[in-house]
Design a protein with these regions (language model features):
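Short linear motifs at protein or domain termini
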Residues: 1-6
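C-terminal all-alpha effector/ligand-binding and dimerization domain
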Residues: 9-151
């Protein structure tokens, strides 16, 4: 967000180990039994009353326990990974329209059934190993999406 000129305030909702789902095992590899789950609500600075601009949930390998040394209300996940030589080399993003269910609409301060954009990112290192899987839910009425492509 900062790179796009948006200052944000972050609220950490969940930061813990959890059993990997089948979907996460498929992405991280069959040896992945547990992952670290980091869920955050992000608000535009000084706009707390307007509601969050994104609900982001990141899943990282169980071995990345160094992450628990960080305060993610202030620290950047990207910076924490770089500081531990977890350099992002490639990223795949999938964008899907989403109708907010009860939990998400409550967290986002929106009506159930409101529209959002779900962006799922899979980040890999230069060896093709998955560094993180992140699901970000952006309510459409609070966000604008612009793609600039060179042809």
């Amino acid at each position: 967000m900062f790179r796009r000129g948006i200052e944000v305030e972050t609220e950490v909702l969940e930061f813990r180990y959890m059993e990997a789902t089948e979907d996460l095992m498929e992405k991280f590899g069959d040896n992945c039994q547990k992952v670290i789950k980091l869920s955050r609500l992000r608000y535009a600075k000084d706009s707390f009353d307007k509601g969050p601009i994104v609900l982001t949930t990141s899943y990282l390998p169980e071995g990345d326990s160094f992450l628990f040394d960080y305060d993610f209300t202030k620290a950047s996940l990207t910076t924490a990974l770089k500081e531990h030589q977890k350099n992002r080399y490639s990223m795949e993003k999938e964008m899907t329209a989403l109708v907010l269910g009860g939990r998400e609409s409550h967290l986002m301060g929106m009506k159930e059934g409101s529209l959002a954009m779900l962006i799922t990112s899979i980040t890999k290192n230069d060896k093709g190993q998955v560094i993180d899987v992140t699901e970000s839910i952006y309510p459409l009425e609070r966000n604008k999406f612009v793609w600039k492509l060179k042809l």
